[in-house]
């Protein structure tokens, strides 16, 4: 880990929503495949739930209705319950929306807010529980490959492994 603590960047980013309608087909398939893990994580992974119901609205102006309908059609492959709502219903769900701007919206009641800290902590416990170690303040200064192994040089030591993952 380059930073002084694990998760310095990853736990503070805005990827804290579970949205089966987000991204391209590959991302959506990966998201759908991970649903069971978040709904029912392995025993001991976390003492608290990994997600909570949140729901999301995606709004559209009148000139964007066609695009919104296309998005709803595509989204229903993964989230059959996604709803297209009119502007009045969108404003009922979120009263701060302007009536002169919002003509329609999608409402995804299946969207969930992820507990990033619980997820990150669960993975860290899993790593260390299996004998793994997290080394911090270890920015890679050189990376070489020799005889099927990678060698990473850092200010705190040299590490060798058959696989390197750039998780930045």
Model-derived segments and their meaning:
Residues 3-5, 90, 123:
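Short beta-to-alpha linker loops that shape the active-site pocket of alpha/beta-hydrolase fold enzymes
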Residues 15-93:
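Dinucleotide-binding Rossmann-like beta1-alpha1 core, especially the glycine-rich loop
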Residues 73, 101-102:
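Acidic/polar active-site rim loop that often engages polyanionic ligands
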Residues 9-15, 97:
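Short, flexible, mixed-charge acidic loops at enzyme active sites
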Residues 106-163, 167:
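Helical element adjacent to the flavin cofactor pocket in flavoenzyme catalytic cores
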């Amino acid at each position: 880990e380059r930073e002084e603590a694990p998760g310095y960047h990853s736990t503070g980013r805005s990827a804290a929503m579970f949205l089966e309608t987000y991204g391209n087909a590959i991302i959506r398939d990966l998201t759908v495949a991970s649903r069971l893990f978040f709904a029912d994580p392995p025993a001991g992974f976390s003492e608290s739930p990994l997600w909570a119901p949140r729901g999301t609205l995606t709004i559209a102006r009148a000139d964007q209705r066609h695009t919104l309908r296309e998005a709803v059609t595509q989204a229903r492959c993964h989230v059959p319950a996604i709803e297209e709502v009119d502007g009045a219903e969108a404003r009922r769900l979120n009263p701060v929306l302007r009536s002169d701007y919002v003509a329609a919206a999608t409402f995804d009641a299946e969207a969930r807010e992820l507990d990033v800290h619980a997820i990150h902590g669960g993975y860290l416990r899993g790593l260390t529980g299996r004998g793994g170690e997290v080394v911090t303040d270890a920015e890679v200064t050189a990376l070489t490959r020799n005889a099927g192994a990678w060698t990473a040089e850092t200010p705190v030591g040299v590490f060798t492994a058959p696989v390197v993952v750039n998780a930045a």
